[in-house]
């Protein structure tokens, strides 16, 4: 895996550097409620600023469908960026044209300028050549630090890298290096944990993983679909009965590839989904007809932790149970803590990603102990599915 990084950028004082960042952060009542994505790109911005570059930030926010929408303006995000950088962040009311050009002309070396939402122009999502040219006119160099948007072939994520010398920012670099360790060229055995509610959203992912990992642990609601396909009565549990044949084909593909499929042996069942609901641990073949499985049971956790103990590499996407509500978080927390402990010992490379997964690891208070936790969502999932990522592929081509 070869691409240029900030290490390849020298003598950039006074140069205009267009930096694609991810500022698509949650906002409530005009305030940013989670600054994780801003914190992730801060090191790249600081490093470029210290080298004397003029840093021009490009980002999208929401889905404005190619025209200005007042409450999707990036102006509201600028104060949060300022606070994290501890540096003044200037703002331009457009990302191309005179408003952008005039703001850039007033920049001093080391300054940071945030341009308006790229998606206020239809050309962004269409990767329109004229729009790409207009964006490229604002810079001398291009840095992509938004892996989370790398699965989109948009003007600011892919088009610009064809017009300007292109480099990976520090977050992009860290993400790509972690993913290479996770699935690209991993230490074996490799174990994947895939959970979450539905098989239907993760068919491509499961079909790709069985070819690449030594064991695939299936948890969450999606495990019920696999169990039902094997003739287990899952009661009132969340289950996609119409995907029984898909589940069987994934099991067959795993067998052909020598990948062990690990399904729950026992489950925590309840008759209602609420905090503190009456619950019981039952054998997976003894689920009451009027109950639903909301977590995997202790026997299953022991088996999962045994696989984690044998693994050199762990890739995790999706919780094992309905972790948002106690006590149905126990399995996810136990497996996460075990993986974190082995990672701290230096015995395991652990890579995790996806919104629910990040929330679950934070809930277990172990996110910082994993080798890498991706905040990228869709891009992380598409990488796990083995799909090309245009924003990454173009960086490789430039090298």
Curated annotation (Swiss-Prot):
CC annotations in GO: cytosol
Keywords: ATP-binding, Cytoplasm, Glycolysis, Kinase, Nucleotide-binding, Transferase
Reactions the enzyme catalyzes: (2R)-3-phosphoglycerate + ATP = (2R)-3-phospho-glyceroyl phosphate + ADP
Known pathway: Carbohydrate degradation; glycolysis; pyruvate from D-glyceraldehyde 3-phosphate: step 2/5
Pfam families xref list: PGK
Binding site for substrate: 22-24, 37, 60-63, 119, 152
Superkingdom field: Bacteria
Major enzyme class: transferase
Cellular localization per UniProt: Cytoplasm
Gene Ontology MF term list: ADP binding; ATP binding; phosphoglycerate kinase activity
Keyword check for Ribosomal protein: no
Keyword Nucleotide-binding: yes
UniProt-listed GO biological process terms: gluconeogenesis; glycolytic process
Residues the entry annotates as binding ATP: 202, 324, 354-357
EC number: 2.7.2.3
Family: Belongs to the phosphoglycerate kinase family.
Subunit description: Monomer.
Protein name listed in UniProt: Phosphoglycerate kinase
Classification lineage: Bacteria, Pseudomonadati, Pseudomonadota, Alphaproteobacteria, Hyphomicrobiales
């Amino acid at each position: 895996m070869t691409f240029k990084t900030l290490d390849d950028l020298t003598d950039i004082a006074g140069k205009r550097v267009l930096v694609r960042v991810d500022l698509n952060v949650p906002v409530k009542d005009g305030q940013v409620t989670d600054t994780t994505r801003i914190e992730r790109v801060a090191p790249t911005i600081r490093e470029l600023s210290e080298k004397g570059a003029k840093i021009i930030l490009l980002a999208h926010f929401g889905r404005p469908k190619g025209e200005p929408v007042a409450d999707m303006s990036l102006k509201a995000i600028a104060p949060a960026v300022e606070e994290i950088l501890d540096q003044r962040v200037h703002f331009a009311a457009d990302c191309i044209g005179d408003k952008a050009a005039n703001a850039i002309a007033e920049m001093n070396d080391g300054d940071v300028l945030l341009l308006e939402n790229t998606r206020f122009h239809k050309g962004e999502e269409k990767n329109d050549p004229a729009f790409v040219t207009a964006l490229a006119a604002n810079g001398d160099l291009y840095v992509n630090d938004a892996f989370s948007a790398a699965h989109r072939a948009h003007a600011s994520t892919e088009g610009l890298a064809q017009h300007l010398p292109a480099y990976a920012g520090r977050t992009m670099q860290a993400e790509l290096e972690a993913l290479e360790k996770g699935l690209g060229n991993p230490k074996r055995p490799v174990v994947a944990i895939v959970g979450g509610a539905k098989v239907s959203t993760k068919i491509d992912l499961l079909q790709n993983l069985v070819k690449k990992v030594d064991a695939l642990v299936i948890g969450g609601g999606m495990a019920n679909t696999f169990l039902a396909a094997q003739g287990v009565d899952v009661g009132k549990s969340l289950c996609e009965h119409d995907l029984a044949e898909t589940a069987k084909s994934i099991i067959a593909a795993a067998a052909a590839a020598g990948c062990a499929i690990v399904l729950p042996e026992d489950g925590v069942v309840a008759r209602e989904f609420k905090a503190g609901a009456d619950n019981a641990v039952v054998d997976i073949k003894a689920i009451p007809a009027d109950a639903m499985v909301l977590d995997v049971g202790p026997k299953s956790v022991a088996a999962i932790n045994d696989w984690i103990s044998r693994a050199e590499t762990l890739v995790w996407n999706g919780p094992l149970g309905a972790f948002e509500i106690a006590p149905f978080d126990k399995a996810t927390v136990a497996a996460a803590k075990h993986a974190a402990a082995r990672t701290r010992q230096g015995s395991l490379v652990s890579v995790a990603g996806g919104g629910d997964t990040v929330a679950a690891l934070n809930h277990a208070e172990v996110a910082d102990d994993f080798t890498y936790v991706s905040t990228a969502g869709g891009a992380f999932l598409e990488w796990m599915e083995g799909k090309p990522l245009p924003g990454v592929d173009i960086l490789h081509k430039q090298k």
